[in-house]
């Protein structure tokens, strides 16, 4: 008790004073019924295919395709994490501006994947170049590697397009 007989009010409980998370996408399985959820699923599918195809070509040009592998593997796992946070409903428990985080994530990955797509297409275009081993010209990419890299380039483009669509949807949610 204080000097005047009045009691001091208890300090506010910090758990009660947290603001509500800002997210306009639904949490739980309902995320899969939205365009954004469908695009994230396509990003995971196509990104996984890029990863598998580049790895199966034995990475004949590591300087170019190393970045493609890094981007595809990293984006694959972060997209899985992103989808997992929404499917589990954790986005409603974590105080963050999820609309901005969605935009920032998709912008970053779109820029990186666009660069990866260009590098993969550049690696594929080197099919007709030859290098000299003991006076015999050997192609940089054999026909099997070329075919795999063509498929990887196509899926890298499709993945980039999916990230671009997700970026557009995220921008609409973030900037009403």
UniProtKB/Swiss-Prot annotation:
Domain of life: Eukaryota
Membrane topology (UniProt): Multi-pass membrane protein
InterPro entries for the chain: MAL (IPR013295), Marvel (IPR008253), MARVEL-CKLF_proteins (IPR050578)
Transmembrane segments: 35-55, 67-87, 103-123, 150-170
Record has Transmembrane helix as a keyword: yes
Major localization listed first in the record, in broad terms: membrane
GO biological process: myelination
Protein's UniProt keywords contain Cell membrane: yes
Gene Ontology cellular component terms for the protein in this record: apical plasma membrane
Keyword terms, alphabetized: Cell membrane, Glycoprotein, Membrane, Transmembrane, Transmembrane helix
Glycosylation sites: 132
MARVEL domain ranges (all copies): 31-175
Segments on the Cytoplasmic side according to the record's topology features: 1-34, 88-102, 171-176
SUBUNIT field: Interacts with TPD52L2.
Family: Belongs to the MAL family.
PANTHER family: MARVEL-CONTAINING POTENTIAL LIPID RAFT-ASSOCIATED PROTEIN, PROTEIN MAL2
The protein's name in its UniProt record: Protein MAL2
Species for this entry: Pongo abelii
